[in-house]
């Protein structure tokens, strides 16, 4: 849904990337910093410190924005950087959900439903683009930002003691992630049909 605004977002983030370059900070620095913020978020959620965890989500997203902006501003994008960014994003998302499971706010069943959906929606896209010869498989009901918005809402609800709405938000994260997985799988099939795997 929000991917349609990606071009505008990338253009507006360039000045921040230039500022990062002046500080001699690399895209991979921001990628790893994003993962570190997610790790702190997991510990915060594990201790039921929801507002601190929410702050870490904001920091994580700012760092994620800066890694791409820095790469574009300095023409520093690499294949390895892209893979590293993709992997740390998934680790980060899993850590945040894991933190909510650690403190018991989210049941293991619901947490794994959400986490597995997040991972599989991303995995099918990666395989479609690497093995299916598809230039872009950014299709489906929800991308990363939509899922993070729902996660943020869940954290806010937990923070004010509204557990049921929070649980619903986590369930929606899982539901839209699994729907996106199916949509991407069907899209991939329609593109490659019976093309032999390589």
Give the role of each language-model region.
Residues 1-61, 96-198:
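Hydrophobic alpha-helical transmembrane segments
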Residues 60-63, 89:
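Alpha-helical transmembrane segments in multi-pass membrane proteins
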Residues 64, 85, 180:
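Conserved G/P- and acidic residue-centered "switch" motifs that form tight phosphate/ATP-binding loops
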Residues 68-110:
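Basic, amphipathic juxtamembrane/active-site segments
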């Amino acid at each position: 849904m929000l991917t349609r605004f990606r071009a505008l977002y990338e253009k507006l983030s360039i000045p921040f990337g230039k500022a990062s370059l002046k500080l001699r900070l690399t895209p991979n620095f921001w990628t790893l910093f994003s993962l570190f913020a997610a790790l702190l978020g997991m510990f915060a959620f594990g201790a039921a410190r929801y507002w601190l965890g929410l702050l870490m989500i904001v920091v994580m997203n700012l760092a994620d924005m800066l890694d791409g902006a820095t790469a574009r501003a300095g023409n520093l994008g690499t294949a390895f950087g892209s893979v590293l960014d993709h992997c740390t994003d998934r680790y980060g998302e899993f850590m945040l959900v894991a933190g909510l499971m650690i403190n018991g706010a989210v049941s293991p069943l619901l947490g794994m439903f959400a986490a597995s959906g997040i991972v599989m929606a991303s995995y099918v896209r990666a395989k479609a683009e690497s093995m299916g010869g598809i230039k872009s498989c950014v299709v489906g009901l929800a991308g990363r930002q939509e899922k993070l918005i729902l996660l943020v809402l869940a954290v806010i609800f937990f923070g004010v003691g509204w557990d049921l709405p929070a649980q619903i938000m986590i369930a929606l994260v899982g539901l839209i992630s699994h729907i996106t997985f199916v949509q991407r799988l069907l899209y991939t099939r329609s593109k490659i049909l019976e093309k032999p795997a390589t």
